[in-house]
Amino acid sequence: MKILVALSGGVDSAVSAKILKDAGYEIEGCYMKLHGRDDYHAKNIEKVQDVGNFLEIKTHILDLCDDFKREVFEPFLQTYKVGKTPNPCALCNRTIKFGKFLDFARSKGCDKIATGHYAKIENNLIKSAVDLSKDQSYFLANIEPRVIPNIVFPLGNMLKKDVKKFAASFPELEKISKSSESNEICFVENTYIDVLREFYKTETPGIVRNLQGEIVGKHNGYMNFTVGKRRGFDVFGAHEPHYVVKIDAKKNEIVVGSKADLDKNEFETQNFNAFLNIDEILKMDEIYVKIRYRSAKIACKIEISLNDNLNNESLTDKNLNFENSDFLNNQDLKAKIILKTPANGVASGQLAVFYDKSDCVIASGFIA
């Protein structure tokens, strides 16, 4: 079996390649150029070539900058522009790392691709990694279900500290083993607002309203805020903390309330991405949802229906087979999520990820 390994220049991808090589697989490496900063790429490519020389494997450089700009970066900007909170990693994994990269691997005669993500695959489902502090199953939950048989995650059963220890045992990988962690969003060096300032006038004064619609303060531009933020705006005569509850991009207004006002008992998602048959998901006794990467899982119930532009007929009691239905395009489906306990700070634009009781990802959807 021939596997193309995504090499970033970091320890996780290097160890992934080493593990697969030691296991007897025929492997090649590939570095993906996703955004600008030539000096950034030059340093990483040098590291990737060093890993390739150490493992005695062929390495490729795949320029996906145009695809990344169109599929990830521009939607990132647009999502903030309309007052929502984007999840660029979820978009990148679907369209770039497990889309274009997989296409490239096939063009090179490879059977599968491998990455340094901390996750597992079990029964054709993505599953949480052993190292829950590094688990990346959340970010992988938006990939197309059909690509899972073509993916390998060598680090799924390893702890991060053991990955570094393993790398340090080889002189050729010792330097990489001591490298710092990469940014959560690869193209954001400091904060997201610094990126937005390059394209938008982010400092535009606006008003703050309470939940009753009354003007209670002022702010310096709605793009500076996400749901749940409690600083950066002024509330006249406030004696207790206020939190952003809602953002009105068209009016350049934010709505604030107490922390309790952030609690939601239900919400809707768009682009429902199912990894199991719809009827199988609907019949599950236990389903848990994460509303953002670092949030705890919350028990929930899912009600699935067609998007408004198709039909609003509920599918809750229908016996629909996902594989043999007309719903292979996740754009067709939306879901209503009913929480067993309230969730704090549900943000439109973020990814909601659904797990079964064994920590396998069964579906995902973007919060409406």
Swiss-Prot record:
Protein's cellular compartments: Cytoplasm
EC number: 2.8.1.13
Location of the active site: C92 (nucleophile), C186 (cysteine persulfide intermediate)
Domain of life: Bacteria
Coiled coil regions in record: none
Broad class of where this protein is predominantly found: cytoplasm
Record: residues binding ATP: A6, L7, S8, G9, G10, V11, D12, S13, M32, G116
Name of this chain's protein: tRNA-specific 2-thiouridylase MnmA
